[in-house]
């Protein structure tokens, strides 16, 4: 699908879909719990539906109804052997978490995915699972792969380049036969691990860890219990309408946001404020008032929030001066190399970008329409759409974004929501 975007702004009120990270963790725990769980307001997207299918294939019973809530009857940790490899689509989080859960089964469980997922590194997680007693086979440390358990517990080191490796092991380790000790020499994306720990705390899982998150001791032989939880709005997704209002001079009110939630990407509000944005927040909401905003440059550390790099690079393109986005080398390991891709595509739109190993420097300027490519990365596609909205009203040609169907990975209603709010979008 191609998305054509012309000069426009958004104004109005909206709600963002539920958090993808919370939805996948909820599915993982519910699928292993003994008894019925209820997940309210889940994100229904390509990634979460891949995880839902995986949970069903492993023996969980799930009733979707109208998708306002999912009823999940878990396996109690006794998974069945799937009839075929589990297709995780484009979900890196899902692949890593469900690969770790598969290590609890004595049957071989295989995983596949799309072309992008097959490029995502899996070796650090597979090596840790092997240390804990599983047997794994893979295509050079990548998907497709097979995991045969059960893990028995033990001690291993975990590469913290991606927090997903640690989160996956923390979700599987309580159900291992023995205790598990996880050593983490360094850790990126700390808020995502804190989200996992919050879920484990609600489950009363017995584990200990130090304040620097370098050592975790998980007691084995535990059981997940059924739960009834509501998924909060996704701050990673909320960044897009907030940014669109900021850079186009529009206004937006988002109501379903919980600023007490551990989601790291709520930091978008503070990061944008550091660049001059005026964002009002309160219990459950964030608001940008209509009117022009004079944005200025800043130096932003995105180590905890790598998913914000694409949209913040667009905000930086609309700001005066040179904005530096740094300490976020892991952004190169997402659905695409987001540093390289955003630098390349913004240059097409007339913006000067200097790329370095762990980030980029963006010199603000006047964006011009261009034919750009999302490289099938949902956050890149949405960020480029917002960049296209800022191009001059006198421009005759639109910005055209290739592979815009990738937006369905996390925000399937993006085009409809933005069009309702005033964006000039046309999907072909």
Regions found by a protein language model. Give the residues of each.
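Short, structured segments at the rim of ligand-binding sites
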Residues: 1-428
């Amino acid at each position: 699908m191609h998305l054509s975007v012309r000069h426009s702004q958004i104004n109005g009120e909206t709600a963002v879909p539920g958090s993808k990270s919370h939805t996948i963790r909820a599915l993982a725990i519910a699928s292993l719990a003994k008894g019925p769980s209820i997940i309210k307001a889940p994100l229904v997207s390509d990634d979460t539906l891949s995880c839902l299918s995986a949970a069903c294939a492993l023996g969980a019973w799930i009733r979707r109804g109208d998708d306002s809530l999912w009823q999940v009857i878990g396996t109690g940790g006794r998974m069945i052997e799937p009839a075929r490899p589990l297709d995780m689509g484009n979900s890196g989080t899902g692949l890593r978490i469900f690969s770790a859960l598969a290590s609890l089964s004595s049957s071989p469980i295989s995983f596949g995915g799309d072309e992008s997922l097959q490029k995502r590194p899996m070796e650090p997680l597979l090596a840790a699972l092997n240390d804990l007693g599983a047997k794994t086979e893979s295509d050079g440390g990548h998907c497709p792969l097979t995991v045969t358990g059960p893990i028995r517990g033990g001690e291993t080191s975990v590469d913290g380049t991606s927090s997903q490796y640690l989160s996956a092991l923390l979700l599987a380790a309580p159900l291992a036969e023995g205790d598990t000790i996880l050593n983490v020499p360094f850790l990126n994306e700390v808020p995502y691990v804190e989200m996992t720990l919050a879920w484990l705390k609600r489950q009363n899982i017995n584990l200990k860890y130090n304040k620097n998150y370098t050592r975790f001791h998980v007691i084995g032989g535990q059981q997940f219990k059924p739960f009834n939880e509501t998924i909060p709005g996704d701050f990673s997704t909320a960044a897009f309408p907030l940014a669109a209002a900021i850079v186009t001079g529009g206004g937006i009110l988002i109501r379903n946001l919980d600023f007490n939630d551990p989601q790291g990407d709520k930091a978008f509000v503070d990061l944008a404020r550091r660049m001059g944005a005026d964002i009002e927040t309160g219990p459950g909401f964030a608001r940008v008032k209509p009117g022009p905003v004079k944005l200025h440059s800043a130096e932003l550390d995105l180590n905890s929030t790598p998913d914000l790099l694409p949209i913040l690079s667009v905000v930086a393109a609309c700001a005066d001066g040179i904005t530096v986005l740094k300490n976020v080398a892991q952004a190169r390991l997402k659905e695409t190399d987001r540093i390289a891709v955003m630098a390349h595509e913004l240059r097409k739109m007339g913006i000067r970008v200097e790329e370095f190993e762990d980030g980029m420097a963006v010199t603000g300027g006047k964006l011009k329409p261009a034919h750009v490519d999302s490289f099938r990365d949902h956050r890149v596609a949405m960020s480029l759409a917002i960049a296209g909205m800022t191009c001059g009203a006198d421009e005759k040609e639109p910005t055209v974004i290739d592979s815009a169907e990738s937006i369905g990975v996390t925000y399937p209603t993006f085009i409809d929501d933005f069009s309702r709010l005033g964006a000039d979008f046309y999907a072909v």
